[in-house]
Structures are given as C-alpha cells and as structure tokens.
Amino acid sequence: MKVLWVALVVALLAGCQADMEGELGSEEPLPPEQPRGQDSQPWEQVLGRLWDYLRWVQTLSDQVQEELLNTQVIQELTVLMEETMKEVKAYREELEGQLAPMAQETQARVSKELQAAQARLGSDMEDLRNRLAQYRSEVQAMLGQSTEELRARMASHLRKLRKRLLRDADDLKKRLAVYQAGASEGAERSVSAIRERLRPLVEQGQSRAATLSTQAAQPLLDRAEAWRQKLHGRLEEVGVRAQDRLDKMRQQLEEVRAKVEEQGSQIRLQAEAFQARLRSWFEPLVGDMQRQWAGLVEKVQLALHLSPTSPPSENH
C-alpha cells in the first residue's frame, strides 16, 4: 500500500509539472540523471520516468502548456485521499467496536494507537497535496514574465526542482518507514499486553479456566483473521482504483504527445510552403535587379570609352 501511494504521488507530480517547462531554452544543460537499475524501488523508477518526462515537456508549445495547466490532477488526488481516509476511518471504528470485550485499558491503548496511525497517514497525504499546489503556484507566477527572462530562470529552476523532488521523495520514504515501524511496534505491544493478561489464566492449572481461556481466545483469533482479510481486500480495491486512474492519465498524456507531434508536422509543412512562396516572390525581383545593374554598368563603361581623351587644338 505504501509503495503504491509513493508511485501514485510521484506520477501525479509528473502530471502537474507538465505545465511548467514548455518553453525552456538550451542555454544551460539539465542536471545529469541518476542511473536506474532493475533492483531500484518502484517509486525511484517512477521518479526517473518523471525526469524523462520533464525533458520531453521542454519541446511542448505554449498552447499545449495552457491545456495542461489546470487543477484536475490535484482534484483527482484529493478524491482518492478522501476515499482512502474514509476506508481507514470505517475500519478503525469497526475494530474499536470489536475490541469492546477487552479490558478498558487495553482497548483505550489500541484505539489511541490506531488513531495516531490514521492521523500520521492523513498528515503525510495532506503534505503531499500541499507540495503539488506549491509547485504549480510557483510555475504559474513565473509564466507571467518575458520569454527571455523565463528561459533564463527556468533553466536554474529545473535544477532546484529536481533537488526538491529528490529530497521530498527521500523524506516520504523515511516517513513511510517510521509509519510502518510505528504500526508494527503498536501491534506488537497490543499482542504482548493481551498475552500477558491471558498468561495468569493459563498458569492457574485449572482445566475449567484453561478451557474458558481457549474458548475466549479462539473467537478473537478468528475475528482478527477476518479483519485482516477484509482490510487486505479493501487495500487491494484502493490499489486497483489508483492503477486505473494512473492508466487513464497515461493514456491522456499519450494523446497529448500525439497532438503535439501532429501540430509540429503541420507547422513544418506551413513553414516550408511559406519559404517556397517567399522564394517565388523574391527570385524574379532579384533577377530583374541584377539585369538592370548589369545594363547600368555596361552603359557607364560605354560612356567612358566614348569620352575624348585630349583637349581640342587652338586656332591661330
């Protein structure tokens, strides 16, 4: 689930950044891309594809940039975040209801740990959405400048943006690691507390107490397994929806690429036709001017040859 979220967010970043670098010049080279191997994490591979996409977007025209400059990506991310948080909240409430037979102290501790994990997950996703909006706002502010100034600033901004993306990805990786460790630690503490409370009943040596503890523990294990399977199914459902949306966005980007290529071909054909038209206009004019100049030179040379070379003699 965590790796899927990272891949989703980085791919969405690529969609948001597509409206940034339409008219970049070639004054300064982009930072070198780090090598990506088959053993790298999925989110690292997606981040590499993002940088490849940024390089491709440099060739887009202003019109295509304006078409891509909208809030659809952030809205899609917001809807997916809200759906996921609803699923997590529903599961937490159901789990708290199932924990009612437990001791009050154990129930309060488990509920508190579940709420903390939910809050951390919501905070991480909200932070990612805020970063997307921040990147988009910065680029919108830069697009109001002149073309030459925008070219100069965007070359430097790309390098800084790559560093920020790498830093954000590393920060998200650390947050997910902390969240996973915290969830594992909380679950281990809960199981340990339940085990400690059940151990005195088992150690009493009375057959009736052992039977009762076994009968009480088995339904709890069955319900825990049912919860695990239900949560696994919900997470798979969320993952499928996220993958479908990624596929849809990838298809839209392919359509934009095809549209850009088609427009580029039309522009080239129009430029060639205009060049041929200019040539047909100016070539006769240049030829006529050359002929007139040659005639003028010839007349001047003839006039020079016909002029007298000595003064007339005086009459005595």
Swiss-Prot record:
UniProt-listed Pfam families: Apolipoprotein
The protein's role, per its UniProt record: APOE is an apolipoprotein, a protein associating with lipid particles, that mainly functions in lipoprotein-mediated lipid transport between organs via the plasma and interstitial fluids. APOE is a core component of plasma lipoproteins and is involved in their production, conversion and clearance. Apolipoproteins are amphipathic molecules that interact both with lipids of the lipoprotein particle core and the aqueous environment of the plasma.
Protein name: Apolipoprotein E
Modified residues (Methionine sulfoxide): 142
Stretch list, region Homooligomerization: 265-316
Lipid-binding and lipoprotein association: annotated segments: 209-289
InterPro entries in the record: ApoA_E (IPR000074), Apolipoprotein_A1/A4/E (IPR050163)
Assembly and interaction partners: Homotetramer. May interact with ABCA1; functionally associated with ABCA1 in the biogenesis of HDLs. May interact with APP/A4 amyloid-beta peptide; the interaction is extremely stable in vitro but its physiological significance is unclear. May interact with MAPT. May interact with MAP2. In the cerebrospinal fluid, interacts with secreted SORL1. Interacts with PMEL; this allows the loading of PMEL luminal fragment on ILVs to induce fibril nucleation.
Annotated signal peptide: 1-18
Gene Ontology biological process: acylglycerol homeostasis; cholesterol efflux; cholesterol metabolic process; chylomicron remnant clearance; high-density lipoprotein particle assembly; intermediate-density lipoprotein particle clearance; lipoprotein biosynthetic process; melanosome organization
Any one GO MF annotation of this record: low-density lipoprotein particle receptor binding
Region entry Specificity for association with VLDL, spans: 277-289
Record's subcellular location: Secreted; Secreted, Extracellular space; Secreted, Extracellular space, Extracellular matrix; Extracellular vesicle
Modification comment: APOE exists as multiple glycosylated and sialylated glycoforms within cells and in plasma. The extent of glycosylation and sialylation are tissue and context specific.
Residues binding heparin: 161-164, 228-235
Organism: Capra hircus aegagrus (Wild goat)
Top-level taxon of the source organism: Eukaryota
Region (8 X 22 AA approximate tandem repeats): 79-254
Keyword annotations: Chylomicron, Endosome, Extracellular matrix, Glycoprotein, HDL, Heparin-binding, Lipid transport, Lipid-binding, Oxidation, Phosphoprotein, Repeat, Secreted, Signal, Transport, VLDL
Keyword Transport attributed: yes
PANTHER family: APOLIPOPROTEIN, APOLIPOPROTEIN E
Sequence repeat start-end pairs: 79-100, 101-122, 123-144, 145-166, 167-188, 189-210, 211-232, 233-254
Keyword Transmembrane helix found: no
